[in-house]
Amino acid sequence: MSLRRRGIVVSFHSNMVTVEDEETGERILCKLRGKFRLQNLKIYVGDRVEYTPDETGSGVIENVLHRKNLLTKPHVANVDQVILVVTVKMPETSTYIIDKFLVLAEKNELETVMVFNKMDLYDEADLKKVRELEEIYSELYPIVKTSAKTGMGIEELKEYLKGKISTMAGLSGVGKSSLLNAINPGLKLRVSEVSEKLQRGRHTTTTAQLLKFDFGGYVVDTPGFANLEISDIEPEELKNYFKEFGDKQCFFSDCNHVDEPDCGVKEAVENGEIAESRYENYVKMFYELLGRRKK
């Protein structure tokens, strides 16, 4: 009887699953035990599994190990972090868009690394915008400044990617694919295929895959949080996803930091401890969510 081994699901092929063995790195095409269908058990890219290899070089997945998280659209399990790629022109990423991405990452309990990309294209006015963004976010999230063209920041970014499952996020055109090519040129063909796949239309159903970095770690081939949808968040829950709000003392324990008196968050905004843009974006999202609930 073959001994069970452990691996990670990296892709699907019809009703078969490709598993990468955690010790050898070998990729095994596996089928699922009947119990998955009978018990309606789901399996996703990123799942860590136990499988039994057979004499033909294939295998059978026996169990899915503990899943720490599950992202949707696309479904990917056990993601460690979001690499949020931001540009200040071509296209410009507003602080509102940045904060929406960050809310989704916080809701999913994911670490975030902010990447200011296309640094080689910026003039002095653009660099001023970069410095303003740094002032807002540098105490909240790690920031890496990059250029796929010059190689700036690529080695630093690799250190964040090493040994983790990452998903890239950011507006279309910020250079996610180009960054991946610069980080790991061996991904180039696959990344270009993914770019074409994504451009076929937002309603195209795609199955995510994990692309492996030569230096260790994986990246999901489909950007995370592509539709920036926050409608499943309750208005009263939103404050939990602005990390700098957490230690502020308010008179009311259930303060939403909007129109309540004696609010520690509003006081912190007035004192310059919390960036005005962060607070304004919070209030805008709060009323958006409140409006949807009333419909």
Curated annotation (Swiss-Prot):
Residues holding GTP: 117-120, 170-178
InterPro entries: G_CP_dom, NA-bd_OB-fold, P-loop_NTPase, Ribosome_biogen_GTPase_RsgA, RsgA_GTPase_dom, RsgA_N
Recorded GO CC terms: cytoplasm
Cofactor note as given: Binds 1 zinc ion per subunit.
GO BP: ribosomal small subunit biogenesis
Enzyme class: hydrolase
Single GO molecular function: GTP binding
Sites where the protein binds Zn(2+): 250, 255, 257, 263
Domain (CP-type G) ranges: 68-228
Classification via CDD domains: S1_YloQ_GTPase, YjeQ_EngC
Source organism, top-level taxon: Bacteria
Known EC number: 3.6.1.-
PROSITE patterns: ENGC_GTPASE, G_CP
Compartment(s) where it occurs, according to its Swiss-Prot or TrEMBL record: Cytoplasm
UniProt cross-references to Pfam families, sorted A to Z: RsgA_GTPase (PF03193), RsgA_N (PF16745)
Keywords: Cytoplasm, GTP-binding, Hydrolase, Metal-binding, Nucleotide-binding, Ribosome biogenesis, RNA-binding, rRNA-binding, Zinc
Record's keyword annotation contains Metal-binding: yes
Cofactor: Zn(2+)
Keyword check for Nucleotide-binding: yes
PANTHER family, A to Z: SMALL RIBOSOMAL SUBUNIT BIOGENESIS GTPASE RSGA, SMALL RIBOSOMAL SUBUNIT BIOGENESIS GTPASE RSGA 1, MITOCHONDRIAL-RELATED
Subunit structure as annotated in this protein's UniProt entry: Monomer. Associates with 30S ribosomal subunit, binds 16S rRNA.
Record's function text: One of several proteins that assist in the late maturation steps of the functional core of the 30S ribosomal subunit. Helps release RbfA from mature subunits. May play a role in the assembly of ribosomal proteins into the subunit. Circularly permuted GTPase that catalyzes slow GTP hydrolysis, GTPase activity is stimulated by the 30S ribosomal subunit.
Similarity field: Belongs to the TRAFAC class YlqF/YawG GTPase family. RsgA subfamily.
Protein's UniProt name: Small ribosomal subunit biogenesis GTPase RsgA
Gene name linked to the record: rsgA
